[in-house]
Amino acid sequence: MSTRSTLSLAQLSPGTRGRVSRITRDLTGRADRLAALGVTVGAEITVLQTFPGIVFECDQTELAVERAVAHAILIDPD
């Protein structure tokens, strides 16, 4: 059985796929916005870009978030 570490979205490389395992901090209103866009526990994501900003795909939508927000989104990579 393979053991994989949970990493923040900010730690992942472009092309990495995984599932959201949790969102760790109060994002002062951003958590509701992320949820409305489909970024919820269990959602599948694919990292598209990590510089200069974090861009990822979730539910067929490309999203860009600040690095601080990306650190708060924990992912179980595939």
Regions found by a protein language model. Name each.
Residues 1-78:
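Compact, glycine-rich, soluble single-domain proteins
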